[in-house]
Amino acid sequence: RLVGSEMCIRDRLQMRHNNVSKVHIQKFIAEVESGAYPAPDVFVFSMGTNDRNLGSAEEALKGKTLDEVDVNTMAGGARWSIQTILEHYPQCRVFVCTPIQTGNPEHNALNLQKIAILRELCRALSVQLIDCYSNCGITEKFEQPSGSGRYLRDGLHPDKPGQELMGRYIAKEIRNHFF
């Protein structure tokens, strides 16, 4: 458990992590507006894996604008990110990928909480949720908490075969739900 200054450092890192996402999206939009890239037809988010300060979907979904959204929570950052892309690119299909199972059952319990929040946000914003946790083929039963398993190199991050497995699943889901 983290206490005192360690917790403060973790919270600041979480805040920085969410703000990095915001900066990347703002940079992407600026590059599209400058003509460096075409407007996207599809935008895929992979959300929740590194988040600790979850917030709630209920709080993140308050109001119609993004003015009051707390981007320092996973829920608020996700809403801000998704809605910003939808506002700038109304013809774009947005997909949100959930975290995958890890080799650590406790981490997976936290991932399930994140997925419940992401599912509620996706429903409210009418975007497709891609359930990598339940359907990509990576299961905690074949992974190690902090070592190499079937598809995870360290209990958390997919190795090359794991990346390929996830990629095929995500591509199939996009193909099956793109209209």
Positions of predicted regions on the chain:
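Conserved SGNH/GDSL esterase-like catalytic core that processes O-acyl groups on lipids
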Residues: 5-76, 110
